[in-house]
């Protein structure tokens, strides 16, 4: 499978963004342990990057505050990316909230509440009935 340059650049930007958020941003509105970069989509010309961010917090107000803090930090983040990654043009960054991890956790919780017996238990029960 052949990877396009935009795929390689998006992975590199994802790695650098995670590092910048975890170690460099000092905004008190950001709780870096609760922020995860899920995906980065690059345009073909590498001038635009759409960054999908997941924030692990149930308080919607804190999530909105964190997103605003990321928006305010965009110039700094863009400058850091241009310093760390050698590109002809530093991409314009757009942050999007991604709640797919939260959605997956909710589905997992619902499935666990269904009390479906595990397959191993079903096999053991059917073997016991065959012996009788």
Curated annotation (Swiss-Prot):
Main location: cytoplasm
SUPFAM superfamilies associated with the record: Ribosome-binding factor A, RbfA (SSF89919)
Gene Ontology terms for molecular function: ribosomal small subunit binding
Entry keywords, A to Z: Cytoplasm, Ribosome biogenesis
Gene3D superfamilies reported for this sequence: 3.30.300.20
Intracellular or extracellular location(s): Cytoplasm
Pfam families: RBFA
GO cellular component, one term: cytosol
InterPro entries referenced in this protein's UniProt entry, alphabetically: KH_dom-like_a/b, RbfA, RbfA_dom_sf, Ribosome-bd_factorA_CS
The keyword Cytoplasm belongs to this UniProt entry's keyword annotation: yes
Biological processes, Gene Ontology terms: maturation of SSU-rRNA
Domain of life: Bacteria
Family listed: Belongs to the RbfA family.
Function comment: One of several proteins that assist in the late maturation steps of the functional core of the 30S ribosomal subunit. Associates with free 30S ribosomal subunits (but not with 30S subunits that are part of 70S ribosomes or polysomes). Required for efficient processing of 16S rRNA. May interact with the 5'-terminal helix region of 16S rRNA.
Subunit structure: Monomer. Binds 30S ribosomal subunits, but not 50S ribosomal subunits or 70S ribosomes.
Protein name: Ribosome-binding factor A
Underlying gene: rbfA
């Amino acid at each position: 499978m052949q990877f396009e340059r935009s795929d390689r650049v998006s992975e590199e930007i994802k790695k650098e963004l995670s590092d910048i958020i975890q170690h460099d941003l000092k905004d008190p509105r950001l709780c870096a342990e609760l922020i995860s970069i899920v995906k980065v989509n690059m345009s073909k010309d590498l001038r635009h990057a759409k960054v999908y961010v997941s924030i692990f917090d149930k308080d919607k107000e804190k999530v909105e505050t964190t997103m605003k803090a990321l928006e305010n930090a965009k110039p700094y983040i863009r400058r850091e990316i241009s310093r760390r990654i050698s590109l002809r043009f530093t991409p314009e960054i757009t942050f999007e909230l991604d709640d797919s991890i939260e959605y997956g956790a909710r589905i997992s919780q619902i499935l666990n509440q269904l009390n479906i017996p595990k397959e191993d238990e079903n096999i053991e029960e059917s073997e016991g009935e065959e012996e009788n």
